[in-house]
Structures are given as structure tokens and as C-alpha cells.
């Protein structure tokens, strides 16, 4: 799969999302182990990479996004509809929950991410 390489990170104190251009200064990647634009590395989420996939509305899907699966034709048989975190399986396949993401794309909508919207996965706003 040929896809653009994109990353983003969430600044946790304000929950503001920064894309890679925001994290690069004067054409050099800033030392992520110390400071980013005067902010401590510990204040940022881990980097989230673009999966190369888009949801049913054309929105980019990144690692740690939360997608909602709705109206999947198999839902009445095996219960697919619901909210899932996007990530990699043990076999390095891009999944949402235990479902392969590319199999459910026509039914997937990005509704948030696990840093700004943990409540969508049953967590709390404070996590």
C-alpha cells in the first residue's frame, strides 16, 4: 500500500492535536525526548501514524482514533456494530478492535480519538 507518511500527537494538558509540521522546527525534527516548542515530551501522547485509510466520510484514520461501525450487514449475526480503537494487531495488521480495518471501512466513521474522547470507549475524561 502506497500512502503518505503522516504523524500527529496530542498535547495532553490542553488536548490539542499537533500534526507533524507543528512538531518540526527549521527543517529538523525536534528532540522528542526533551522539549517540543517549549513543552515537555511527557505532556504529549505517543505519536499516532496515519493508517492510509479513510472513513466513509473521507476523513483520515490514524492510530488511536476511535471509529464507530454502524449498519454492518453481519451485525445481526455476530454483533459488529460499536465503537473501536484503531491500532495494530500482534501480526501488525491495522485493526479496529479485533476486526481488520479494511474489511469494515464502508461502515466506519471516525468519532474521536482515545486521548480527547476516552469516554467513547467506556473510559473517563480524566484518563
Model-predicted regions and their roles:
Residues 1-127:
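Secondary-structure transition motif
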Amino acid at each position: 500500500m502506497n500512502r503518505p507518511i503522516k504523524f500527529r500527537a496530542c498535547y495532553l494538558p490542553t488536548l490539542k492535536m499537533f500534526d507533524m509540521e507543528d512538531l518540526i522546527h527549521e527543517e529538523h525534527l525536534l528532540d522528542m525526548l526533551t522539549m517540543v516548542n517549549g513543552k515537555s515530551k511527557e505532556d504529549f501522547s505517543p505519536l499516532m501514524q496515519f493508517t492510509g485509510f479513510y472513513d466513509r466520510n473521507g476523513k483520515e484514520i490514524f492510530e488511536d482514533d476511535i471509529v464507530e461501525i454502524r449498519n454492518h450487514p453481519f451485525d445481526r449475526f455476530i454483533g459488529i456494530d460499536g465503537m473501536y480503537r484503531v491500532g495494530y494487531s500482534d501480526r501488525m495488521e491495522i485493526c479496529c478492535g479485533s476486526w481488520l480495518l479494511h474489511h469494515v471501512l464502508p461502515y466506519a466513521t471516525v468519532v474521536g480519538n482515545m486521548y480527547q474522547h476516552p469516554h467513547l470507549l467506556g473510559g473517563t475524561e480524566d484518563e
